[in-house]
């Protein structure tokens, strides 16, 4: 994790929040500079969340960690985090809000959200991958308005390409003709494991692949955990199963709700790197229960019960 801090004289605070993979390359760039009103023409300022439409990738939230809000005058950090979650989950690219006059630590808390990369990165896991962010720019104007601009992880062109490919795979694997939900998932699980290898070079910055995204998983044959989980999450959405991504400092995997029960899937660990280079598929982390996962007692699969309190 790296943090860059720059400060110039001027009128406006300019925060950049960056999310990459999990929490490894978050950057804070705090700049004071002039900020002209004509830059704000495309920003939404509303008093009620229903005044703006959600995009089609809005995801129901079951976590108590954050919630959709129609209060865009936050008075504390919890309410501030809810504003960011609401903007992200609704798919809004630009948005404006005001901190309540009593909220004297507002700017410090915005900076804190930038420094504490986990908070907004955890929010990303509760979103549809298409609504997740790669960076968030927050501009503070001297009239007290904070303008948010979101750079999404996936471009519209990539979304269209991924959606088409997932539909092609579903047809090729005859997923819709399989009765069992677990079997549908297994067939897709095996297909993705077969066409991919783990991109070990991504961690040292030498990779030439988009392995942290579904683009790398579906088209380049190289993935890391975020690429596997995004791809599986999008597939589970396609077959209308409620699902989320789970993350900690080191790793991310999927959970899916089937017939009222939550099951964990770690496609990354089911597609292991072998000494011989042989491509093998395992099922050690395929649709296992929370007690089964916890019985393995692995640090890489620890997760916050506060954030994922809905998983039993």
Where are these regions (language model features)?
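Sec-dependent N-terminal signal peptides of Gram-positive bacterial secreted proteins and lipoproteins
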Residues: 2-22
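Hydrophobic/aromatic-rich core segments of domains that either
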Residues: 227-293
